[in-house]
């Protein structure tokens, strides 16, 4: 039923042999092995339908072989890179970049399969399949670069962040937002928190978001300077006015 179509001596040898090795060239010619210079492969979508039937075997084999032999072969696993394949044929640095991306892609793929099979709470080894969600303004400190990575198919609100206005988020902002969400979600009544460096400097409840936020800011207005505001209820125009005033007086994020 086609299970071993690509696990084939001719294919794998054609990908792996060294074009600069005279002995390899002679053997390839003797055995009728074709020279395969480009491998473009999309894996079975295991993340869409986690099942034994969607575990790819032949695809990863070809990808791994091509990535290992990046000096002689171009491997592409992302459709966004297809337009760069021809250029990579004459650019070893680009081929190496593609190889690194291929190995990361395989690791991402296999980690999901491992999670599917595992019944251990704390396995001896673990790899998290993280996918980049967005570039950040900086990491924990302004001199550091950073990006936000999210576990796929999770309902994390961090993966749904949408900037409506202002500067891009920093790593510190993301941490503060997470800390704020984990704080206010503990309450059923209207609750607001002002978070700074992962710690709340003001938490309050009220009859609505407006009252809760006003109380949270007034709990420690000095420490609230530059903080992140989080509420567990929708904001109305009156709440937005408090946010606007807070923004005028500090460099906090909304």
Describe the function of each predicted region.
Residues 23, 46-47, 201, 237:
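Glycine-rich nucleotide phosphate-binding loop and flanking beta-alpha elements
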Residues 1-7, 26, 38-41, 100, ...:
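Non-catalytic interface/targeting segments
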Residues 5-13, 42-49, 67, 155-168, ...:
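Gly-rich Lys/Arg/Thr-decorated short loops/hinges at beta-loop-alpha junctions or inter-strand turns
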Residues 108, 118-254:
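Long, structured protein-protein interaction/assembly regions in large complexes
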Residues 19, 56-60, 174, 213:
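Catalytic, metal-anchored helix/loop core of enzyme active sites in primary metabolism
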């Amino acid at each position: 039923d086609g299970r071993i179509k690509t696990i084939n001596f001719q294919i794998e040898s054609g990908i792996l042999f060294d074009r600069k090795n005279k002995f390899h060239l002679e053997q390839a010619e003797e055995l009728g092995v074709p020279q395969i210079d480009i491998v473009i492969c999309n894996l079975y979508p295991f993340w869409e339908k986690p099942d034994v039937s969607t575990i790819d075997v032949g695809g990863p084999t070809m990808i791994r072989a091509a990535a290992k032999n990046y000096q002689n072969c171009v491997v592409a696993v992302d459709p966004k890179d297809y337009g760069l394949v021809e250029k990579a044929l004459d650019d070893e640095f680009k081929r190496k970049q593609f190889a690194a991306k291929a190995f990361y892609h395989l690791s991402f793929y296999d980690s999901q399969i491992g999670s599917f099979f595992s019944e251990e709470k704390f396995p001896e080894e673990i790899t998290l399949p993280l996918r980049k969600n967005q570039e950040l303004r900086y990491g924990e400190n302004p001199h550091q670069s950073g990006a936000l990575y999210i576990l796929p198919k999770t309902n994390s609100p961090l993966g749904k962040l949408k900037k409506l206005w202002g500067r891009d988020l920093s790593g510190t902002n993301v941490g503060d937002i997470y800390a704020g969400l984990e704080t206010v979600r503990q309450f059923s009544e209207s609750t607001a928190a002002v978070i700074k460096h992962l710690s709340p400097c003001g938490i309050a409840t009220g009859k609505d978001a407006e009252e809760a936020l006003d109380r949270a800011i007034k709990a420690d207005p000095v420490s609230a300077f530059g903080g992140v505001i989080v509420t567990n209820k929708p904001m109305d125009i009156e709440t937005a006015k408090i946010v606007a005033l807070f923004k005028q007086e500090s460099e906090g994020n909304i």
